[in-house]
A protein has these predicted regions:
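Thiamine diphosphate
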Residues: 21-170
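Active-site or pore-adjacent capping/gating segments
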Residues: 1-19
Length: 170
């Protein structure tokens, strides 16, 4: 009965002002940097390769992780080849293309997290990010606060910027 629940809400005590900032930030086990930034015995690599290797590492360590977005699937492997070989290694069920629909790409991470996945998504160019900002700002960034810490969205959103070319009329 809606009326009963409404009366319960009206009768509820006022929120405690000292707790208003609880759950603004999701807890993290990472509190400091570890490892060496430039190990002496390693060769330097291109930034695009570093991104590829980082995603590969995440996908190897977390079988529930997925990579999807614009042109990251097997055929192209990313506009800058930043996802090359990932579909071959992890399969088309974990690395796949989506429609060119930035709001969907970013917003779908909420549902993917609810289903137990660890989504990694890519918007093809920073020029295209604007339609997805509403999902990022109103849903993902506030998920820990709005759920009282019960459902912080864990996603990684990759957006290439600063390379040659561009994508949109922005």
């Amino acid at each position: 009965d809606v009326g009963h629940h409404f009366q319960g809400a009206v009768a509820a005590p006022e929120p405690d002002p000292s707790k208003v900032s609880n759950f603004v930030f999701a807890p993290t086990p990472v509190t400091e940097e570890t490892g060496e930034r430039e190990p002496a015995d390693k060769e330097k690599i291109l930034m695009v390769d570093a991104g590829l290797f980082a995603i590969r590492e995440i996908m190897e360590d977390h079988p529930e992780s997925l990579l999807y977005g614009q042109d990251v699937g097997r055929r192209l492997g990313g506009v800058f080849r930043e996802a090359a070989t990932l579909a071959e290694q992890f399969g088309d069920h974990r690395v796949f293309n989506t429609a060119i629909q930035e709001a969907y790409i970013i917003g779908s991470t909420v549902g993917m997290c609810a289903a137990g996945a660890k989504p990694i998504v890519e918007v093809q160019f920073a020029d295209y990010i604007y339609p997805g900002l509403n999902q990022l700002v109103t849903e993902i960034s506030k998920s820990c606060f709005l759920s009282c810490g019960k459902f912080p969205i864990q996603t990684l959103i990759r957006v290439p910027i600063g390379a040659y070319g561009g994508g949109g009329p922005y």
